[in-house]
Every structure is written in C-alpha cells, then in structure tokens.
From Swiss-Prot:
UniProt cross-references to NCBIfam families, sorted A to Z: 30S ribosomal protein S12 methylthiotransferase RimO, MiaB/RimO family radical SAM methylthiotransferase
Keyword Transcription among record annotations: no
Protein species of origin: Sulfurovum sp. (strain NBC37-1)
Record's protein name: Ribosomal protein uS12 methylthiotransferase RimO
Reported cofactor(s): [4Fe-4S] cluster
Length: 439
C-alpha cells in the first residue's frame, strides 16, 4: 500500500484565517499532517495582509519554506496577502506553485490536483457543510458568523480585499454549533470583522441578540463569547443581553482604536469620545465583566495632546486587556494620503502604551487573587512539567493568558474538563490556583 502524501500547513494572522485553514484541512483529509516542512509533499501558507508586520511575516514564512522544501513538493500561498497583492505576487514570486486568495478554500483539493492558481471574485464564508477540521482543542471552536465589513475606517484596508458585510444565516450557524456540540465541543468563540453588525445585510435589526438566543437553546453548549464588537453598532441592549446570558460570558471585546474626538473623526470611526465611554461604562457596570480592547499609536493627526489624552484614559479606565498596534500606512486607505507621523515617534508612543497595557493587565490579575473560578485544563504547562496550564472559561483562547495549577487536591486530572479552582497567588504576571472540584 503506497504511503500517504504529507501536508504542512501554516495559518498566519487572525482566528478568522484559522477557520479558513481548518476548511482546507477538511478538504485534504487524505494527506498526513506533518510538522516537518522538509518532508511535506504539499505546503500551504494561509497568509495575513492586514498591516506591514503581518505582510512581512507572510512573505518571510513562504520564502523560508521554499528554501527548505523537498524536490517536487507543491508550495501554495493562500489568504489575505495573496488576495490583496495577487498581480504583484504572481509576477514577483516564481517560488510559489499555486496562488489563491480568500474565495477558494473549499476548492483547495482541486487546485492542488490541477496545480492551478485561482482567485474567485466572491469571498468564501465557511458554513456547516464545510467539513472543517477543528485544530488545537478538543472542546473549543471558533465560529465565523460573517465576512467583510461595511465600516470605512481610515486606516483599514480589509474591506478592499474582503468586501462588504456578508452574514451567515442563523440556521447555518445553529447547525454548525449543534453539530460540534454533539461531537463534544462545549466552548465557542463567535468571530467576524465586525460582529456587532451581524445580520444587518439580512435586515436583522438585532442579529447578534438573535444569535445569542439561538445558541443558548443548543444542548451541550456550556460557554461562549463574542469577539470584535464595533462601537457604533454595539447597543446597550446587546451589552445587557450578553450580561444576562447563562451561556455567554460577560466578556466584551470592543476595539476603540482611540479616545480623542479629533482622532476618532479622522479615523472615520462613526463614534466620538462621549458615546464610546458610555458604552464602555455600561459594560464595566456589569457584574464580573471582562473588557478587552485595542488602540492604534501614531495615526495621522494624532497630536502629542491627543496621545497624552489616550494614555490617561487607558491608564485610568481599567481594561482587563488591551493591545497596541503601531499605525501602519496602508495603500487603498484614506489615511494613506494624509501627513504621516515619523516612525520613531510611532514606535515611542506604542512602547508607552504597551507599558500601560502591562500595568492594566497586572491590576486585572491582582483582582482575581482569592476568587473561585471555573477553568478548563489544557495540559502541562510550558513553564514547568509539574504545573498544569488552565484557562478561566471567561477568558478568550490564547490571547488572555493562562492560570497555572500548582495543587490538584489529588483530583483526577482530565484535559479539556472544567474544574472549580481557587486563585491563590500572583507571581510576577502569573496567577496560581488550586483545584477544588470537577464541575
């Protein structure tokens, strides 16, 4: 019997990209997955084209894999970078055997068989029939609820290659979640470019609220959270619905990008300082709420005074987590033609915001000491073989950190199972906890 061909796949960028990578894995089940790229018959890099750093990572990854690939292997470049720069890349990168963008993930097996590059005009949106292979977890899955975005933020090129908002039907989402719940998945993260706009293209007034109600009724779903809310499409009613839900975590991930009115106007965010703060305060007023956001350092028009105002707000408000992005000047965006802030000033501002973010996270972690939390054990810790890595169910996967279990109370430990635990201490930026019981 001939040995199976081997596949090496790297998924770069966001979790939305990961879902598309999982669709490709589902179409290539006859291949054996290998971590060793030098022995792979097919190598796929699902690229990110969001900002300069991501573009650079994508190109470097592809070129490094090409240098190490075995003879007669097939190298595929898919995803956002490939879509965004399809003409230039096909001309400048003869190392690549197959180029494909954001429309053909479900046809990847056909493209490899015919060794043909294709760019479909429609953006692909995974459904319950995609046959994706969930990676990295036996209990958690990302559910993509929409593609594209109707916002017109000055700094963002995503609508230029992902198009307008295109939502999945509620029944499609319900079927996928139900199917995964029947397979034992119980924790779900709902994602898109602008999740709070979900359903607006289908004339659903409160699409996300409708989705919450549907998911709450699915047997086997224990926990869920929504990522990527957008201020101008987030309502007080949505905030209340999330807080009142028995299934959805009181978890608010809403990138604000800035807080100064003048900068927000230049960014074309559609919401000013006052309305943004009203939303954030309403979120923060909910019992045990967790708030995550992101900001941009050095957008054109950000004066020193605007920046200092942002710093003061981020220091004082009390976010549990926030990310800082260096402003990246992207062609096809309206900010591209604006007068740019020097890179050294952008770097300096981003560093200051990064330090504020660390202090903000530390204060959030300190509040957890002494609390009893529900957490799921993911496996042995990378820090120490005698410690276990766990994640509170409220936190998002990968981005919010881990809690280390240093005392199991002699309970039988099962990876992927939920336990009640008491957080006992904070060492540096690392929380430690003791298991109390299996839930």
């Amino acid at each position: 019997m001939p040995s199976r061909k081997k596949l090496h796949l790297i998924s770069l960028g966001c979790t939305k990209n990961l879902v598309d990578s999982e669709v490709m894995l589902g179409r290539l089940k006859e291949y054996e997955i290998t971590d060793d790229n030098t022995e792979a018959d097919v190598i796929i890099v699902n690229t990110c084209g969001f900002i300069d750093a991501a573009k650079e990572e994508s190109i470097n990854t592809v070129l490094n894999l090409h240098d190490e690939r075995k003879e007669d292997s097939i190298l595929v470049m898919s995803g956002c970078l490939s879509e965004r720069y399809k003409e230039e890349l096909q001309q400048d990168m003869p190392e690549i055997d197959i180029f494909t963008g954001v429309g053909d993930y479900e046809k990847i097996d056909e493209l490899i068989a015919s060794k043909q590059s294709t760019f479909s005009p429609e953006v692909y949106l995974a459904t319950e029939t995609s046959g994706r292979v969930i990676t990295g977890s036996n209990y958690h899955a990302y559910i993509k609820i929409a593609e594209g975005c109707n916002q017109a933020c000055s700094f963002c090129a995503i609508p230029s290659f992902k198009g307008k908002l295109h939502s999945r039907s509620l029944s499609s989402i319900e079927k996928e979640v139900r199917m995964l719940a029947e397979q034992g998945y119980y924790d779900f993260s709902f994602i898109s470019q602008d999740s709070s706009s979900y359903g607006r293209d289908m004339d659903l007034k409160d699409g996300l609220i409708d989705l919450i109600k549907v998911v709450e009724a699915i047997e086997g779903v224990r926990s869920a959270r929504i990522l990527y809310l957008y201020p101008s499409t987030t309502t007080f009613e949505l905030i209340d619905t999330i807080a009142d839900s028995k299934i959805f975590q009181t978890y608010y991930d809403m990138p604000i990008q800035h807080i100064d009115d003048a900068v927000l106007k230049t960014m074309k965010r559609g919401f000013g300082e006052q309305k943004t703060i009203e939303l954030l305060e309403h979120m923060k007023s909910k019992p045990n709420a967790f708030l995550r956001t992101s900001v941009i350092a050095g957008h054109p028009g950000e004066s020193q005074r605007s920046f200092e105002k942002l710093c003061s707000f981020m220091e004082e408000f009390g976010f549990d987590r926030f990310n800082t992005f260096h402003y990246s000047n992207e062609e096809t965006t309206t900010a591209y033609q604006m007068e740019q802030i020097p890179q050294d000033i952008i770097n300096e501002r981003a560093e200051i915001l990064g330090e504020i973010a660390e202090r903000s996270t530390l204060r959030s972690l300190e509040k957890m000491v002494g609390k009893t939390v529900e957490l799921v054990i993911d496996g042995e810790s990378d820090e120490h073989e005698y410690l276990l890595s766990a994640r509170p169910l409220q936190w998002a996967v990968d981005i919010d950190g881990e809690i280390l279990i240093n005392d199991t109370s002699d309970l039988p430990v099962k990876y992927g199972k939920v336990y009640e635990a008491k957080v006992t201490e904070l060492v540096g930026m690392q929380l430690l906890a003791t298991l109390i019981k299996e839930c």
